[in-house]
Amino acid sequence: MLAYPTTSSPWPPRHHGAAAAPAARRHMAAAAARGKRRGAGAAAAEGADEAAEAADLVRFFLRRTSGGKERLVAVLDRHVKVVRTEHCFLLFEELGRRDGWLQCLEVFRWMQKQRWYVADNGIYSKLISVMGRKGQIRMAMWLFSQMRNSGCRPDTSVYNSLIGTHLHSRDKSKALAKALGYFEKMKTIDRCQPNIVTYNILLRAFAQAGDTKQLDILFKDLDESPVSPDIYTYNGVMDAYGKNGMITEMESVLVRMKSNQCRPDVITFNILIDSYGRKQAFDKMEQVFKSLLRSKEKPTHPTFNSMITNYGKARLREKAECVLDKMTEMGFKPNYVTQECLIMMYAYCDCVSRARQIFDELVSSQNNVHLSSVNAMLDAYCMNGLPMEADQLLDSVIKKGAVPSASTYKLLYKAYTKANDKKLIQKLLKRMNSQGIVPNKKFFLDALEAFGNTDKKPRTVPSKNSASKPDVESANNSGTDTSSKPNLSVWQVAA
């Protein structure tokens, strides 16, 4: 089977200003230069060069088709001499991120007409995965049947894609049943034996569904199989439980993790910090943070961002600001996500003017402000009952070239509906119409829910252990846990 670039690998830096002919000529010239290379390290350099050139060419193709300038197939036809399987694979990845599943099918049809095309499991697996993420279950199943008709024999990666596809469907109980059906079928085929990716997909899915019984069955099956769990296994399950607020179940996975001699990484610490923060178990959250600082792992931006967000939701402004101080003290420069977290924190704490000050600083420090930052400030106004200010901000950012998304309009529509401001609602709908955004049923149902919510914003009651100053300032010092849970702390797992 052909080897393809991993989906998690970052693309090389962009090259701007490339014209069509020069881009193709550069690709062919580089190929000729690679043929002349000799000496140690030539193979590694060649592989890196090939990946960079392929990514560069794919970006060029997508630039040519952006905004409906040209059809992608027409662009591929003009460069047919240099396009190969690896370029199409990269196109599938990028089009999948851009909701371009129909274009993926067009590229696939184009591929099949080329002399160099050979039916391959990797291509079908990628396409099935893309269709699944976009909810195109029938199309994914059609591709699976096409793969078998083309002479390809399904392997583990194809079945993993099928399982992931069904888990994206709306009927979760039916999806889980189908996923288990494929899992059992895989066990009966030698070339399709479940691997750790298969188990990780299923374990996370059942954790998200809160099905602890099936989760225990899968863990037992994993223990009896030749496959060994990895850090992704435990992190995936703990994250799913944590996001569902199932803290006891999350802690039981932590115990299982230690019993299998698997050391936590920074992702593990971040999951625990966020999960305890969501439940406002701040004593445990701070204990995990101290354990992180004592371990070989180092905090990351998400570590601090999560703490700021969760303290903010509990309206603990001083604690959130102490986290920011600790972050700066440790040499971390707040990124735009941190600033968005601060905007929301101050919004929860009734400090809209301070939130706007941070937003203005963010705008002045960046050439292109992320739409998520705009949405954060709009949300800050809306949750504090300031729809007029939100509308004025929207006017301002649109004049500067920002293009609101459906999520932007959704949060504003809910706020304007809650405020019963018909004038702003009409203005917003006209904007949506001019931008070609058509609201669906869910859009209006979510807005109707706003009528039932009479509070200005969620008022959460801090836990009794969270009234004091945060422990982040003294996190480097040893401390004892006064709470009864968890029975096993992260620093004990890491020991």
Swiss-Prot record:
Residues 1-24, 455-495 are annotated as: Disordered. Signal peptide: none annotated. GO terms for molecular function: mRNA binding. This is Pentatricopeptide repeat-containing protein PPR5 homolog, chloroplastic. One of its GO terms (biological process) is RNA splicing. PPR repeats lie at residues 120-154, 155-189, 195-229, 230-264, 265-299, 300-334, 335-365, 370-404, 405-439. Belongs to the PPR family. P subfamily. InterPro entries: Pentatricopeptide_rpt, PPR5-like, TPR-like_helical_dom_sf. It comes from Oryza sativa subsp. japonica (Rice). Residues 462-495 have a biased composition (Polar residues). Gene3D superfamilies: Tetratricopeptide repeat domain (1.25.40.10). Keywords: Chloroplast, mRNA processing, mRNA splicing, Plastid, Repeat, Transit peptide, Translation regulation. The keyword Plastid applies.
